[in-house]
């Protein structure tokens, strides 16, 4: 199985830069990189009423879209679990 291409929305990149600790940012980047090989990893959840998925990374959530035809994953939002879905 070929890897998917990773794309990160500019708003998601800004949200990643705003995350407080280097350790949390590093953990999130590793989770995002893992999406290239497996866009639907164990523990991912499809969001209700949207064509988006989310994965957990500690106290943070990564929201992304999958384009199977174009073989790409686009990260659209990264945020703390309390406010990421608003």
Region roles according to the model:
Residues 30-55:
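A short, surface-exposed loop/turn module that caps and links secondary-structure elements
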């Amino acid at each position: 199985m070929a890897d998917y291409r990773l794309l990160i929305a500019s708003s998601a990149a800004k949200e990643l830069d705003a995350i407080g600790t280097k350790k949390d940012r590093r953990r999130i980047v590793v989770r995002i990189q893992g999406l290239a090989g497996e866009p639907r990893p164990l523990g991912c959840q499809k969001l209700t009423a949207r064509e988006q998925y989310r994965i957990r990374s500690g106290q943070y959530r990564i929201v992304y879209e999958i384009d199977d035809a174009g073989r790409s994953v686009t990260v659209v939002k990264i945020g703390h679990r309390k406010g990421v879905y608003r």
